[in-house]
């Protein structure tokens, strides 16, 4: 009767071969923390990059961090000397307690997840939902999500464009929801909902607007090659959503999904090693 140690041997060999031959597969968990990005614009509250290359031209190429692609569209209007952007920006702004549109690049926690200096800001406007592309199939474990300072104070206090969540009585059943959709090619695999604010509780003391980094489990999305981020709110008007269409993101943890041929090769090698070892023992 083979011992437990004998049965574990092939698995050990598979992991060893994986580490040596295929370091980019599921052996490692890759993390995008935006620490490798270095092109910045200087804002009143700190450094950020929103697609502006500094040459008064439009740019829709997006940008990458740790090999992962982030959608971004920056438009510069030469006639009116005006610019606007949408998609993803990355930021080093540390101004989580300042409200208003001028502070659109700040995460409410003030720093990145775990106190890091860098994080990403998503703004869903002009060109639609923000998108992340991985270039190959991956399994995403989790993403850290929070509100931006701009959206947070808009919901908590209201402003000239948006209502105070809960209304004057505090009883309005408002919410601000982020839906994260996984795609494999053009096929949606699944979706995960995360509430950036939720005022639907019967007990108003349970109402909340997220102000800290929160880890969102995305394992249910399965094997994917892209993520789409959609925002919705109960505060809507003639021109769409009134709530500022922003959220902050950090620490994308994922692993590449091995190609079937690679898995078969590793399995055959492990089985061959184990059979040979058993034969020599006899």
Model regions: which residues?
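C-terminal membrane-anchoring or membrane-association module
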Residues: 273-282
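Extended extracellular/luminal ectodomain segments enriched in beta-structured repeat modules
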Residues: 135-142, 224
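Short coil-to-beta strand junction motifs in C2/discoidin
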Residues: 155-178
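Short catalytic/ligand-binding loop motif for oxyanion handling, primarily in non-cytosolic enzymes
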Residues: 41-43, 148-153, 235-238
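N-terminal targeting leaders for non-cytosolic proteins
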Residues: 30-131, 135
